[in-house]
Amino acid sequence: VRQREEVQEVPRRDVSDAPPALPEPIRRDPNPGFSNAFLHHVYDLAWVVAVLCFGPVLWWRGRRNPELRELVLERLLRRSVGRGDGRPVVLVHGVSVGEIKGARSLVKRFESERPDLEPVLSTTTSTGARVARTLYPHLRVVRFPADHSRVVERFFDALAPTCVVLVELEIWPNF
């Protein structure tokens, strides 16, 4: 679990005020430290070993199952997360269907109160992605990447979110 030494609070705004200034986009762990970096490398090595062991099985099954192939390609960021419209991104992450449905009022509120921000939904499961694309056809819906530090880093570099909202607390080591 990453510890953040500084917390930046965004002040509440009055209705008459302009939106508050946004913080810099989230790109990397702000406090990696030696022990955290070492543990992340060990975890990444375990991912590489798992991919080497199970990669051929996934490749074989993916040849017969296009949905599985698409899932693997999206999770490894071989499919683009898409380009936004230039507004700062707020990443709303819900693991599956329940969290995506639960985020509905939050997303509506973002759209009505902060039209200067672009809500982007991310989900882990195929059913969550299907429901998100149905409920929010006007928003970008992306698959959360596999939990390898380089893949997660590329994901955050591509999206450059200003804020990440976790609908339900589910944290992986590289997130």
Task: Give, region by region, the residue ranges found by the protein language model.
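Residue-level detector of intrinsically disordered, flexible termini
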Residues: 17-20, 45, 131
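Short, Lys/Arg-rich, polar N-terminal cytosolic tail immediately upstream
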Residues: 22-34
